[in-house]
Amino acid sequence: MTCCNQQSSQPKTTTTCAGGETSCYKKTWSDHRGSRTERGCGCPHVKPGIKLTCCKTDECNN
C-alpha cells in the first residue's frame, strides 16, 4: 500500500506502508494557523472536531 504523507498544502509525497497496512488516512482540522491537513498510513482514532477520511487504494488520500 502506498499512501500520500505530505502535510497541508505541501507538494505531494508518498510512503510505502509497513506491516501489511491496507488503508490510508487524511485528517483535516482548523487551528490558529488556519486549515490543517495530515496524511499517512492506517486509519487512526481522532479527537472530536477533526475530520477523518480513510480509504483503501494506493494514494487515495491525496
Curated annotation (Swiss-Prot):
Tissue: Expressed by the venom gland.
SUPFAM superfamilies, per the entry: Snake toxin-like
GO cellular component, one term: extracellular region
Predominant location category: secreted
Keywords per UniProt: Acetylcholine receptor inhibiting toxin, Disulfide bond, Neurotoxin, Postsynaptic neurotoxin, Secreted, Toxin
Subcellular location: Secreted
Single GO MF descriptor: toxin activity
Pfam families membership: Toxin_cobra-type
Domain of life: Eukaryota
Cystine pairings recorded for this chain: 3-24, 17-41, 43-54, 55-60
InterPro entries, sorted: Snake_3FTx (IPR003571), Snake_toxin-like_sf (IPR045860), Snake_toxin_con_site (IPR018354), Toxin_cobra-type (IPR054131)
Family: Belongs to the three-finger toxin family. Short-chain subfamily. Type I alpha-neurotoxin sub-subfamily.
Function: Bird-specific neurotoxin (tested on chicken) that acts as pseudo-irreversible antagonists at the nicotinic acetylcholine receptor (nAChR) of the skeletal neuromuscular junction. Has no significant effect on the electrically-induced twitches of the rat isolated phrenic nerve-diaphragm preparation.
Protein name (record): Alpha-elapitoxin-Pc1
Organism: Pseudechis colletti (Collett's snake)
Taxonomic lineage: Eukaryota, Metazoa, Chordata, Craniata, Vertebrata
